[in-house]
Each structure stands twice: as structure tokens, then as C-alpha cells.
Amino acid sequence: MMYVSLVHWLALAVALAVPFVTALGNVPYPQDDPFYYPSENGWQNEAPGTILRERKIQAASLGIFEWKLDAWQVLYRTAGARPDKPSYTVTTFLVPSHAHRDRVVTISSPENSNFIQCAPSYAFRKTGVLEIANFEPRWEQMLYTLFLAEGWIVNAPDHEGPESAFSAGRFGGHMVLDSMRAANNFKPLQLSSNPMHIGHGYSGGSTPNGWAASLHESYANELNVVGWSLGGSMTDPLYTLNSLDGKPTSSLVVAGAIGLMDAYRDEVGNLLDDEVWTEEGKIAEKVMRNSCVYESVIRYFGATFQSERYIKGGRNLSSWPQMRKISNMNTMGHNPRFTPRKPIFMFHALYDEEINWHQANKTAVEWCNNGANVRFLTYSSTSLVHVTTYLLNLPYIVQYMRDRFNGKDWYGGACQFDVESQNPALDVNVLGERFRGILEAALDMLGKEIGPNDSILKNRLKAGQNPNTHHKTKLHVLKKGDISPGEGGDHTKESKKAAAKFKAEKKHGKHH
């Protein structure tokens, strides 16, 4: 049975019912805006994170609802798929009232497209007209006030860069890390001399965020990163694209293939046009390059792309050696050299209908085998799917970030794998409280001052208190020290069974 998340169904319904609108003159699209491109030659010689352009903006949601905070956008020098390949992109800084100048949360919003018009930075602009197109980053931006309410400065990079290279993780990882450098370099933010950074990304945002975590040590180890949060994680590009084919969001198969090839075009040339696509496939590529994710999903809802209609010979994308090579290079955990060295919180629904749980779990296990510090939380309820898992984990994410900024221990530097079988949505009180907080967040964007003294989660997210008070994993019984995959810390049947299985295998020498 195929599932489509409720939020996605609603988004599709809105997209079909409301005509797409365009910016009316005062805010040009990125492809028409000189700000998105370096003004002079020589930018390639600047250090990564160097500011090339800057501007103050009026931030807004859906193009019309103003955010009452300070907001800037900067164009900065970064790197492409390889660290020695100069590139550039834009990031957006959001500064709440009474901001903590030593705490920055970098959020990689899902873009999931091959069209620069879908960039998160454009979605932040007040255009003066209702903007329904490019809904993917816009719905997540409504959740940013959960972080702004804490007094944290938010940094939101266009991690797909000028190529709009969706699914190219290393590419996005460089851009995320360099956005942190840009934040440190941007004087109007008035950051402390060594500010703390946390990276966060869910779904399509997990890819650049996870790779930023992986590349931090080798590419930008001067950054004071204190933690990473990622969920619904797309850690293996081809695995994800294969699993999506024929499903409601199958247009991502084409978008992902395009993104991977664009990031490495100097190595693979025009592989897709020359060897892969049929005429129908070329039409699909053109659609992807001129539409945002929900438009392409509507156009190709449920299509099977790895078929003779779209691909020559009906071959699987993984049958091309170039595709396999690039996908392996962009698979988290594949190379032990790129193992994150800062605390990580990962969470994933076992029955995620969009991004398969197994790839994320495999990455967590491989990272742990190479010395990472990870908590991997699995939700085993069949009623939790891709988007709802994110929404219901927001309090966990906020608490995790608080703990990281406050320097609290994270499982003794080891790994912890837990299973949560209870669905918080089954408890009406939890559902009501959580979504009340989210609705308050939305209301705060419609006119209230955004900062640590506003109404968001004021009663529910009190300092030092875990906000998940119903059916939560029992944090006080989580073990410390060296904990291997499968050894859970809660009292659910799944966790006990996994721990017993692991101990039995360890006794017989299957684990070392």
C-alpha cells in the first residue's frame, strides 16, 4: 500500500486549487536578480565564506506575512562538489529580538528541485503577493520561530547552489559549512568571537546537513560546531531514487539524477542527454529544470521513470557506472574518512513512505563503527510517516539543541539506538499541545515580535524540561558508555528484543 503524508496531500490540493502567482516587479526571481551572481571577476580567489554581496531584507512567509525581526541575505564564496572547485550561493540570516550572539542554528530547508527559483532565500522575501508555488521550503519556514523563540540566530543557506544540484550531498555540505563561515564573517550579526553552531536538516535538508557533519573535520574544522540534528535522512542517493520510482513523489527520481549529474558535470559531461533519456525523459528533465517540487509531483504523479518510456532500454539508473560512482561518493558512511566527530541526533520513522528507514539506520551504524557519537531514534508506529514524524519531533529537536548549546553530555561520546513504539498522536493531549505550539508559532509570524519573550511554547518548553511528557523514551534509563547498535535504552518490547538479540550474538562472537 502506498502512503502520501497528509501535509503533502494538502499541499497538492492547495496547489491545484490556487493559481500559481509570480512576483510583481519589486522582487525579481533569483534567475533575474543580479544579487545571486558575483559582481566582479576574481571572486574565485577569495577564501570560502567570504561575503561577496549583502543586503537587508523584509522577511515574510508566503510572500505577504511580515516577520518582525532583522533579516539579511549575503552572497558568499563556497565550493562545489569538490573543495577545490570554487562556487557561490546565498544564505539568509534571521535575527530575533534579544538574540544570543553566540548561538547560530543553520537550517537546511528541503528544496528538492533543479530550479533556482525554488531557492529558500527567495521564499523568505516579501513580494507583496501570495506565493503558493515553491511550497516545499515555505512550510518548513513556518517552523523556524521555534528556534528563533529561543533567541537563536537562524542561518538558512541555499545549499543547492547556482546549479540547483538536488541530492548532491558533498556539494551541499560545503555550502552549509561555508554559510557558517559567512555568518562568522558578517559584522551586522555581531556574533561573539567564537560562536557555537548547530546544523539541522530534515528530508531533503538532511542530505546537505549530514554531509556538512561529515565534512566538518576535513573542510572547516575551525568552526565551533557543537551538534547536528537530522531526520528522515536521505543518506544514499541511488537507493532513495530507486525506492521512490513509481510512488507519488517519483518526480524526485529525475530531479535527483539531474542534481547528481549537474554537480559533477565537468566529470560526466552530458551523460543524461547523451546516454540515458529518451525523448520523454528529456521532456521530463526540462520540466524539472523549470518547476518547483510540487508542480513536478503533480505533473508526474506516480510515474515509473526507470522504464522504456523515459530511459533508453528501460534500464535502472544504477546500471550506469558513472551514476554508481557518484552516488557512492555521496553516500554518508561509505567512506570512514568522512565520519562526523560532533554529537548527532538522528530520528526516522520505520514506515517512512518517502525515505526508506534502512539507509539511514545503515549510515548511523557505519558512523558508530567508526567512532561517531550518535543517538538514532526509530519510530515503529505504522501511523507515523514522513512529515508527521518531523512535526512530532520538534520538541525533541529544540531540547537537543538546548543541551548542545549548554554543553551537556551526549551518551558519553558513544552511540545509542532506541525504538519508540508509542505514537504520540494517539494521545489527544499531546497532539493538542504540540500543534497548539506550532499554531502559536504561525501566529507569531503574523505580527507579534519574534524573540525569546514571545508566546511560542512558553508553557510547554520550559528551561531544562523535556517537553515530551507522554510516551517518551525514558531518558533517565539510557545507558552511558560504549553502546552498540541494537542495544536500546527504553522499555519498549522492540528495544528489549533488539538488546537481547544483540547480546546473544555478541556472546557467540558475531559482534566484536
Swiss-Prot record:
Glycans are attached at residues 316, 361, 453. Gene3D superfamilies: 1.10.260.130, alpha/beta hydrolase (3.40.50.1820). GO terms for biological process: lipid catabolic process. One of its GO terms (cellular component) is extracellular region. Optimum pH is 7.0-8.0. Its EC number is 3.1.1.-, 3.1.1.3. Disulfide bonds join 118-292. It is an enzyme of class 3 (hydrolase). Residues 480-512 are annotated as: Disordered. It holds the Pfam family LIP. Belongs to the AB hydrolase superfamily. Lipase family. Class Lip subfamily. Secreted lipase that hydrolyzes acylglycerol lipids such as triacylglycerols and consequently releases free fatty acid. Can hydrolyze 4-nitrophenyl palmitate to release 4-nitrophenol and palmitoic acid. Due to an absence of fatty acid synthase genes in Malassezia species, secretory lipases are essential for the yeast to generate free fatty acids from degradation of sebum and assimilate them as lipid sources for growth. Plays an essential role at the pathogen-host interface during disease progression. This is Secreted triacylglycerol lipase LIP5. It comes from Malassezia restricta.
